[in-house]
Amino acid sequence: PISIHKLTPIQMPHVDIEEVREGRKAFTQEEWMDVMLRSCGYEPEQLNNREKWLLLARMLPLVENNFNLCELGPRSTGKSHIYKEISPNSILVSGGQTTVANLFYNMGRKTVGLVGLWDCVAFDEVAGIKFKDKDGIQIMKDYMASGSFARGKEEKAASASMVFVGNINQSVDVLLKTSSLFDPFPPEMGTDTAFLDRLHCYIPGWEIPKFRPEHFTNDYGFITDYLAEFIRELRKEQYGDALDKYFRLGKNLNQRDTIAVRKIVGGYVKLLYPDGEFTKEQIEEILVFALEMRRRVKEQLKKLGGMEFYDVNFSYIDLDTFEEKFVSVPEQGGGKLIPDGICNPGQVYTVSQGKSGMIGVFRLESQMLPGNGKFERTGLGSDRDCKESTNTAFNFLKANGNRISGSISTTMRDYIINYQDLQGIGMTGKLALPTLIALCSIALGRP
């Protein structure tokens, strides 16, 4: 006869969240982060701190309700792995083509679609997303903003998070110069600022390494069923106000930005501090990361939507010292509009009143080539005032160049200046003096 001496259930019938909270107290933050990453199959020993934070961000839609996340990056960085393999509560929609009935509500059968059945709906290969119904994207926008949607006579609410993952085919530098970081999206989504503004977080997939065998762990982590169950249990809790004890968000964040940042902060607190115990420094680390992830969305909206999204200088204020700290995105350069140190020859920054009446920073970058005295300007468009003030500067240099320096030539050289409006407030017409300084600087080869 067969007798069973001991039976260990592999699948969890229920999860004791208090057990997780008590267990968390035995770990440091770094150790707990490593356990969470190993539970997902990653080997943290092969990753730097930044990469760990980015990989952990992929789990945010699993712990937060109605969280909208986007990750675009190179191939073979494991973008869709978590949503397909780690949680049985998330579904990966491959192939792109879908219908409103499948995703939201089937009016014929009176059944709720994927958003009502799963905790997280992830779309693989965003470039191929296509709705058979014309109103598909409009309903998706409504759902992403409010967590509810109307079909027929009824309004339905759901809590599923939306994830969009896809491949970037060019380098980030090229994308930033030629289009936007949302370029891989289909045109009806990638140029719709109302849709993109609903994304809470943009993970820079190009910073995550391509996975090799050594990136996968052989070490211990939580069994997948246990991880998925306690992550699902954490969706019921809210930690979005965790930052209010120590910090206040800056004035440049509107309501959507604030909601996004609070959701990211709340998600990270659930993942890293499920016991609810954290220090000011730990919450600041999360807050800086959250502001960066949302600012990346806002920077691209500014490129696509112009003046409407000029407020991208995200900051937070320390409630103890009242010091305001600004947060930048790495791919856009440093956190300051005017960098520290000496500029290159021909590079000039000027502060002036823009077209909108707001004070802003403008950058001039110059180039000098052998030629016959031509003066070319880029970045001014058809603005007459700007062109007149730059012509005034060049004419002054032609008339008085020898008095400034004998080595300045306006007949044997061509000059090109590119003008940039760094804050999107409209180009200033007061460019005569900065243009003259830039021309002299490049002509003499001196900063």
Model-identified regions with their sequence ranges:
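Conserved nucleotide-binding/hydrolysis micro-motifs of P-loop NTPases
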Residues: T77, A127-I129, M162-V172, W206-K210, ...
